[in-house]
Amino acid sequence: LEPPQRPALKAPTDYRIVGTPRHRLDVPAKVDGTAVYAVDVRLPGMLHAALMAAPVFGGRLESVESATAMARAGVKRVVELEQAVAVVAETHWQAQTALAALSPRFGTAGHESFTSAAWSDQQQQTLRTERGDNDHSVGDVDAALVEGSRRIEADYRVPYLYHATMEPMCATVRIADGRAEIWTGVQDPLQTRRRVAKVSGIDAERVTVHNHPSGGGFGRRMPLEGDYVEQATRIAMAMAPAPVKLMWSREQDVRHGFYRPAVSARFEGAVSAAGAPLAWRGRFTGRSEGAAARPLYGIPNQDIRSVPMQSHVPEGPWRSVAFSQHGFFVEAFFDELAEAAGVDPFEFRVANLGDRPRHRAV
């Protein structure tokens, strides 16, 4: 077929679906409780796994004495993983209570003294000593800072954040007859299939992903390296051909997430005697975040830089991505500039959105 050079678009008067209300097909099942989430999966002969990971990120399992757990009713096996230990039993409660009876020894990888507060202080100190990588520059910020009638500075910091999904991490995996199947709720089924294939050694074409609705995702249910999908796969390999459901406890879920990055930022700015913003200098820790770190407003002199810093704490996707941190940084400092200019923050914004009519309308 020859594609048309100028395809004719359907006239709005001929629309039959666009612009009409449509109800989600899954709403009734979610309302009446019949929707099947990953935690609801039940398979014939299914076993249950409970898991304890190293209390320090990066720590490895050194040893575990399994006899106490194995002596409990329903317990089938204690499975040792690189950075965790799991108990497999006939029911989740049996697995969880047997897990509590274990006293595994984990290494700390040298991170036992790490604290979020100390990491935040280190970020702030680094911002005072390092210039960083250029993200965005326009005009002459140094000259504008001298020229301004009032100059201000501000430091901001935001912590690691836990996704707090209503449904904890959960997956059921079956390895049998040269095939792998996984029942879970993820935001990237294809990457999940690749993860299961890599861990199990089974070709991806022989891996089936049964993707269920998830009880909250917000970026947390991306299949990340070393996460629950890989753990469930390794446990199922040890128990093949029986299907095994791994469900994290809430405590495990809080302690071993892939968190929104902790970020610190430092700003300098200046306003003119007429109350207009003249200069904006921003530095922040972490990778370049592009538009998220740039103010929307008409500031003639800007210098925005990122200072790469990375801790051992697992970081993952977060809903709204970098705007979660930088939206707060940018708008809070713009409020500070408005205060320095003696102008109402709303009026200050409207006055400096001249080339952004869409934003002015909002």
List each language-model region with its residue ranges.
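Structural alpha/beta core scaffold segments of enzyme domains
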Residues: L1-V362
